[in-house]
């Protein structure tokens, strides 16, 4: 199963009794605020969930997987997510109950 923005919006509609339009706008607003903060170079800390941070990656040698040719991967800035301890604990607890 994959969680989508539409599914989150539908959940808000059902559980919080928001209108469908309001729940969709709420979800869009939330993700837009996360995007704006990251674009400004700010970390996004969601208590009990985790942190989105920007990380600078240095230039490094690499290999083109299609041709095998050695290439130089340029330095860049990437978004990383670090799960918070509460999220890690809940997922671990759930996984211990579920047998694969």
From Swiss-Prot:
One of its GO terms (molecular function) is DNA binding. Keywords: DNA recombination, DNA-binding, Transcription, Transcription regulation, Translation regulation. GO terms for biological process: DNA recombination; positive regulation of metabolic process; regulation of DNA-templated transcription; regulation of translation. The keyword Metal-binding does not apply. GO terms for cellular component: cytosol. The keyword DNA-binding applies. CDD domains: IHF_A. This protein is one of the two subunits of integration host factor, a specific DNA-binding protein that functions in genetic recombination as well as in transcriptional and translational control. Belongs to the bacterial histone-like protein family. Heterodimer of an alpha and a beta chain. This is Integration host factor subunit alpha. The lineage of its organism: Bacteria, Pseudomonadati, Pseudomonadota, Gammaproteobacteria, Enterobacterales.
